[in-house]
Design a protein with these regions (language model features):
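Structured binding elements
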Residues: 84
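Jelly-roll (double-stranded beta-helix
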Residues: 1-41, 50-58, 69-74, 80, ...
Length: 214
């Protein structure tokens, strides 16, 4: 136990203070038109507006989900509300364990701090607008995380997903898994993040932004 505590403390001194992750460069921030494709989850995002276009009020993307597609994991945004607006097809939103069905012209806002996961259980492609208010680092986060999810020819396994989730939860500070409780995830991130860094994981990579640029 003493060895483990020492490893975690020394690891975090190295991770946070002596060798912190590089600050995100300007070129890595998403721009209008960036298009993220995650074939494993049958999803596609097109950036419509970032905080630069809205004077920091909100950010907006066009979301496409093929039949059977879904956002990879139920999750929580602690710093912003997220609104889903259906343009085409149908969207099923599981919100804190309750499933909501939305059709064309309908919209629903998920308040910050609420677990949620969108699905397309229909037989045709879903197309809709997703808007977050305030924008925080959401556009950068989805750009980078989808870059991570699609770096390999096969889907990320649960261990890889966990390591990255624990690392980025501390870096971005606004997106967490639906469970366990956020306080537990923050404690896990403190323990796990140094190991993730040691194994080569990064919260952001320039190439994970540029790959989506058209």
């Amino acid at each position: 136990m003493i060895v483990l505590v020492g490893y975690v403390l020394v690891g975090n001194i190295l991770h946070l203070y002596l060798f912190p992750e590089q600050q995100v460069v300007k070129e890595a921030y998403p721009i209008v038109g960036d298009t993220m494709v995650n074939r494993f989850a049958k999803e596609r995002y097109i950036v419509l507006k970032t905080d630069r276009e809205t004077n920091g009020r909100y950010a907006e993307v066009e979301l496409h989900l093929e039949p059977g597609g879904a956002i990879p994991e139920a999750h929580i945004h602690s710093n912003y509300d997220e609104t889903f607006i259906v343009l085409q097809g149908e969207l099923n939103l599981v919100i804190d364990g309750t499933e909501l069905h939305l059709g064309p012209g309908e919209a629903h806002t998920v308040p910050k701090g609420t677990p949620h996961q969108p699905f397309n259980r229909g037989s045709r492609e879903f197309v809709g607008i997703v808007r977050v208010n305030p924008p925080a680092q959401w556009a950068l986060f989805i750009t980078q995380f989808h870059g991570f999810l699609t770096e390999k020819q096969e889907p990320r396994n649960d261990f890889e997903f966990f390591l990255q989730a624990m690392l980025v939860s501390g870096f971005y500070g606004d997106t967490y898994l639906a469970s366990p409780p956020i306080s537990v995830q923050k404690a896990l991130a403190f323990i796990v993040a140094p190991t993730a860094r040691l194994l080569g994981y990064k919260s952001w990579k320039l190439e994970n932004s540029l790959k989506w640029r058209r």
